[in-house]
Regions:
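Class I (Rossmann-like) S-adenosyl-L-methionine-dependent methyltransferase catalytic domain
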Residues: 1-58, 64-75, 79-111, 134, ...
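Short beta-strand edge segments in extracellular beta-sheet folds
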Residues: 322-328, 423-427
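A short acidic, Gly/Pro-enriched loop at the edge of an enzyme's catalytic core
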Residues: 112-122
Length: 427
C-alpha cells in the first residue's frame, strides 16, 4: 500500500488524488476540491457555528492536503493521516502556512496515534475505494467510531458498486454494501443520518456517535401521533409536488417540522401508498425549522394522489400527507460526455488515444456500438456507475486507422442512433 502510493505521489500526486488531469497547477488542483468541500460543509450545518468554535477534525487519507487546507478554517485543529510518506511530505509543504493543520504518517490500517473521543468531526473521501482489504476498511470504521467524541459526526465515502470478480489492488479496492453500513452503525450505537448513492462508486454516509446502549433505547420509544408534521412533499430533484412511479426521478423530499432529534435511518419509515420507500438522508434543521427527509420511492403500481405516512418504526409520527404520482416518461438514451480517457477535462480532445464515454438511460449496455471516422470500434469496457439513471461508463481505444485530426464519433444503441460528436485527435 505505502509503496504504491509513494510511487503515485512521485509520478503525479495531483492526478492520482483528483483523477482527471495530469500536471495540474496548484490552483487547478485545489479547485477540484470545491464540490467535496461543499458536501462536507453542508454536514457542519447540523450544529450551529458557535457550538463548533472549539471543534477538532480528522481527515482519513489526506493525501497532499487538498481538502485539509480549505476545511481548516472551520476547526481549532485539523489532523490528517495518510499511508504515504511522500504524500505527507507534500501535505506539510502545502500546509506550512496553516498552523492548525497537522498531517501524520500512519500505518494504513488504524488511527492508533489518537486516543479515543478525540475528534468532533471525521471525514474521508476517495480513500476507502482504494483499499483492497475489506478487513482494513472495517478496521477504519471501528477506529472512526473510537476516535469520535460522543455526539460527534462522521462523513465518509465508500465505493458502493457491486463486487467484481477481479483481483483487488491499491487502485481498484474493495466494495462496501449498504447492509454493511447499516449493520455496523446499529451494532455500534451510531445514529445513521445519511446513506446516499447506493450502488455507486460515491456512496456517502453520515454518522453521529451516540452513547453505549442508545440503539436499544430507540427500539422501545413511542411518540404521540402528530409529534411531527410534514409541511410539504416535493420531487427530490425539483420543487414540483409530484414524482414518477419509477425511474431516475422517482425520489421525494419530505419537509418535516419537529422531527425527533434521535431520528435516523434505522428507525424512520416513509410509506407511500402501500409500499415503503427507502429513506436515504435526514438533513440539518434549516432556518425555517424544517428538516429535509430524502426518500427513494419503491416501484409503484398506482398513480394519482397517494398517502404519505411518516413513522417511527411502526408508530405514526405525523398526520398523513399526499403525493401526486405520475406515470414515468419514456426512456431516452443520452450520450452525456466524451473525454480523453486519462485527461478527463480535455473534453472532446483525445490526447492518449483512450476514449471515455458516459451514457445514461441505457437498459442494454452491450447493444452500444461505436465508430470513429467510419471505422468500427473494437473492444469496449462497460461499467455501470449508477443504476438509478442507468448510467454507464464505456471505455475504448481508437482504431489504429485513425490518425491525428478531426473525426466523427457515431454511437448507436440497438437500432437507435445518437447524435454524432466531433473528436479532435492529437496523436
Amino acid at each position: 500500500m505505502r509503496d504504491d502510493w509513494n510511487a503515485r505521489a512521485r509520478e503525479d500526486a495531483g492526478y492520482y488524488v483528483a483523477f482527471g488531469r495530469r500536471q495540474q497547477s496548484d490552483v487547478d488542483f485545489l479547485a477540484t476540491a470545491t464540490d467535496v468541500i461543499n458536501i462536507l460543509e453542508s454536514e457542519l450545518r447540523r450544529v450551529p457555528a458557535p457550538q463548533r468554535s472549539m471543534w477538532k477534525a480528522l481527515e482519513i487519507g489526506c493525501g497532499p492536503g487538498r481538502l485539509m487546507r480549505p476545511m481548516s478554517r472551520h476547526f481549532t485543529e485539523i489532523h490528517g493521516v495518510d499511508v504515504s510518506d511522500e504524500m505527507i511530505a507534500l501535505a506539510r509543504e502545502r500546509l506550512r502556512d496553516t498552523p492548525n493543520a497537522h498531517p501524520h504518517l500512519t500505518d494504513g490500517a488504524s488511527l492508533a496515534e489518537f486516543p479515543g473521543e478525540t475528534f468532533d468531526f471525521v471525514y474521508s473521501y476517495a480513500v476507502f475505494q482504494h483499499v483492497p482489504s475489506r478487513e482494513v476498511i472495517a478496521a477504519y470504521m471501528r477506529e472512526t467510531h473510537r476516535v469520535l467524541k460522543t455526539g460527534g459526526f462522521a462523513r465518509l465515502q465508500f465505493n458502493g458498486m457491486p463486487a467484481r470478480d477481479t483481483s483487488l489492488d491499491t487502485w481498484s479496492g474493495a466494495r462496501t454494501t449498504t447492509s454493511e453500513i447499516v449493520e455496523f452503525t446499529q451494532l455500534h450505537d451510531i445514529q445513521l443520518l445519511a446513506l446516499e448513492g447506493a450502488g455507486t462508486q460515491y456512496m456517502w454516509t453520515t454518522w453521529r456517535k451516540q452513547p453505549q446502549g442508545w440503539q436499544a433505547q430507540q427500539e422501545d420509544r413511542q411518540f404521540p401521533a402528530g409529534t411531527s408534521r410534514i409541511r410539504r412533499v416535493t420531487n427530490a430533484q425539483s420543487s414540483e409536488p409530484g414524482a414518477p412511479s419509477r425511474g431516475r426521478y422517482a425520489s421525494i423530499s419530505l419537509w418535516v417540522e419537529n422531527l425527533p432529534a434521535d431520528a435516523g435511518l434505522h428507525h424512520l419509515r416513509v410509506q407511500v401508498g402501500d409500499s415503503l420507500g427507502t429513506v436515504t438522508s435526514i438533513g440539518p434543521i434549516m432556518k425555517d425549522g424544517l428538516q429535509q427527509v430524502s426518500v427513494v420511492l419503491p416501484e409503484l403500481e398506482a398513480t394519482g394522489l397517494l398517502p404519505v405516512e411518516l413513522r417511527w418504526l411502526e408508530g405514526p409520527l405525523a398526520p398523513l400527507a399526499t403525493l401526486r404520482v405520475i406515470p414515468p416518461g419514456p426512456s431516452v438514451p443520452c450520450l452525456c460526455s466524451v473525454t480523453d480517457g486519462t485527461n478527463l477535462v480535455a473534453d472532446k480532445r483525445i490526447e492518449t488515444r483512450h476514449v471515455k464515454m458516459i451514457l445514461e438511460e441505457v437498459a442494454h449496455p452491450h447493444e452500444i456500438e461505436a465508430s470513429v471516422g467510419g471505422v468500427p470500434v473494437g473492444d469496449r469496457e462497460f461499467l455501470c456507475t449508477d443504476p438509478k439513471p442507468q448510467r454507464f461508463e464505456v471505455d475504448f481505444r481508437l482504431p489504429e486507422e485513425i490518425g491525428p485530426g478531426r473525426h466523427e464519433l457515431q454511437v448507436s444503441i440497438g437500432r437507435r442512433k445518437l447524435a454524432p460528436v466531433m473528436l479532435e485527435v492529437t496523436s
